[in-house]
Amino acid sequence: MWEKVDQLTPSRYSPYRFFSAEEWAGFRADTPLTLTYDEVKRLRSLGDPIDLDEVRRIYLSLSRLLSAHVEASQLLFEQRKQFLNMEESFKTPFIIGIAGSVAVGKSTTARILKELLARWPSSPKVDLVTTDGFLYPNAVLREQNMMERKGFPESYDVGAVLRFLSAIKAGMSQVRAPLYSHLSYDVLPGEYQIVDKPDILIFEGINVLQVRDLPEDGKMVPFVSDFFDFSIYIDAESQLIHKWYIDRFMRLRETAFVNPESFFHRYSQLSEDAARSIGEGLWNNINLKNLKDNILPTRPRADLILRKGSDHLIEEVALRKI
């Protein structure tokens, strides 16, 4: 199943170590389970079957790994301060990037991790920001004929993303992240999430690991992932993601889309067959193309790949070698 990850190199030369879910679960050690059944149910996205068993099996080991990375990062920061004779006392937040296709479960992973990390014995301050708010407003996308490219790299204000992450890394206070409404399917004008000197920031979005073409003149061009201390890619076969996307679309048709204020309210008025046809078109013409052209190629850049099976649960893990 991992051939596509390692298609360019023989497995023994892979930059990753591969583990089954059962092997990965063994790395939990004595990491405590600090979430309840009801909390997991509240945190998971529509159609995501994650439960306490999955948290025990996958996320407790991941929490332990991230704890080790955060501790090592803090030690390195202190050593570098001494090396450079720095007197500044500001803290540099540890930033975790989470990438993957639409409907693959990024948001659930991000929310579960946020809660687990915030409950470490050290009680770190953990914030979660998604890239949705950094999309250009619909008015701008319409003006530039890009509504059907929404979610593609060019539909994001990358400059705003870079300024936000740079401010976070610089230890600035009261940094604003624009908010997005899935009801109106648009950025909320004048509304922001305030991120105030977190110990850990989780930054989640489909294209956060993407890079741009390098300039020929050697000028410094920052990438979003340059600000990450650790990155995670949520992976699955495209046909599975397709099924999850359509299943979610049809559920939303009977729930969120029923709201007259929903951008997609018109789909709730269609027959089941007509709505399914719309969903298939959105998948094939937009989301599948974005996955193949822009999202999947970033998978080898992740520090950790969580591979899901047909039941939407993680069955394999790839961890980059140090």
Curated annotation (Swiss-Prot):
It comes from the Bacteria. Pfam families: PRK. Its EC number is 2.7.1.33. It catalyses: (R)-pantothenate + ATP = (R)-4'-phosphopantothenate + ADP + H(+). ATP binds at G100, S101, V102, A103, V104, G105, K106, S107. Transmembrane segments: none annotated. Keywords: ATP-binding, Coenzyme A biosynthesis, Cytoplasm, Kinase, Nucleotide-binding, Transferase. Its main location: cytoplasm. CDD domains: PanK. GO terms for molecular function: ATP binding; pantothenate kinase activity. It is found in: Cytoplasm. It is an enzyme of class 2 (transferase). Pathway: Cofactor biosynthesis; coenzyme A biosynthesis; CoA from (R)-pantothenate: step 1/5. One of its GO terms (cellular component) is cytoplasm. InterPro entries: P-loop_NTPase (IPR027417), PanK (IPR004566), PRK/URK (IPR006083). GO terms for biological process: coenzyme A biosynthetic process. Belongs to the prokaryotic pantothenate kinase family. This is Pantothenate kinase. The gene is coaA.
